[in-house]
């Protein structure tokens, strides 16, 4: 049983309903997380704004891979289920890739560097080394993208 009530779209505050409709239009479903956050229209607006902003330099595959790696570190079954669904249906990742992603790796070398870094961020609570930062930058990630990897980890926590 959920500790907080998860509203249906119609039970959500009126100010949250357009945001929930947008999520449903994009994903084809409205995950429970979004419906729960909709209890606070301000929180939903902020969550959706941050999620949208992070979609500008890191592609959907990279963001979903990071979410899978972070969910595994956090041992969050709900998050793993949700991001596996999104990985398959939105990011178009295959099962082999998603299994690697959950372990903080990828078949793609550049994505692998992002995931190794993201996993270290999650496991160390953000206390990464200069060597960790240098490795992800060597893979071609700009400073702004390194920050966005960190924020994607935080968004998944």
Regions found by a protein language model. Give the residues of each.
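Hydrophobic alpha-helical segments
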Residues: 1-157
């Amino acid at each position: 049983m959920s500790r907080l009530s998860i509203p249906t779209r119609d039970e959500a505050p009126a100010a949250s309903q357009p945001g929930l409709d947008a999520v449903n239009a994009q994903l084809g479903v409205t995950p429970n997380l979004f419906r729960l956050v909709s209890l606070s229209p301000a929180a939903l607006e902020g969550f959706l704004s941050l999620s949208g902003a992070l979609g500008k330099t890191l592609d959907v595959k990279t963001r979903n891979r990071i979410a899978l790696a972070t969910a595994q570190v956090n041992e969050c079954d709900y998050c793993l289920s949700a991001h596996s669904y999104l990985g398959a249906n939105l990011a178009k990742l295959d099962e082999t890739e998603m299994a690697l992603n959950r372990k903080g790796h990828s078949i793609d070398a550049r994505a692998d560097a992002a995931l190794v870094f993201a996993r270290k961020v999650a496991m160390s609570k953000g206390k990464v080394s200069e060597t960790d930062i240098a490795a992800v930058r060597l893979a071609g990630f700009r400073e702004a993208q390194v920050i966005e990897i960190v924020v994607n980890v935080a968004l998944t926590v």
